[in-house]
From Swiss-Prot:
Keywords: Ribonucleoprotein, Ribosomal protein. HAMAP family: Ribosomal_bL33. Belongs to the bacterial ribosomal protein bL33 family. PROSITE patterns: RIBOSOMAL_L33 (PS00582). The keyword Plastid does not apply. GO terms for biological process: translation. This is Large ribosomal subunit protein bL33. The gene is rpmG. One of its GO terms (cellular component) is cytosolic large ribosomal subunit.
Length: 56
């Protein structure tokens, strides 16, 4: 039986101010810092930085 998850759900929110977001998971033990990644924002129609925020 698999152990209970070490992965937490996170929301990656666009820094372009469009309100667009992606959801994903990350391992808190191996990556304790906040995630920031370049992804495509379909509202702004270009690649922008997405920053990790909490899922409410």
């Amino acid at each position: 039986m698999a152990s209970k998850g070490g992965r937490d759900k996170i929301k990656l929110e666009s820094t372009a101010g469009t309100g667009h977001f992606y959801t994903t998971t990350k391992n808190k033990r191996t990556m304790p810092e906040k995630m920031e990644i370049m992804k495509f924002d379909p509202v702004a129609r270009k690649h922008v930085a997405y920053k990790e925020t909490k899922i409410k």
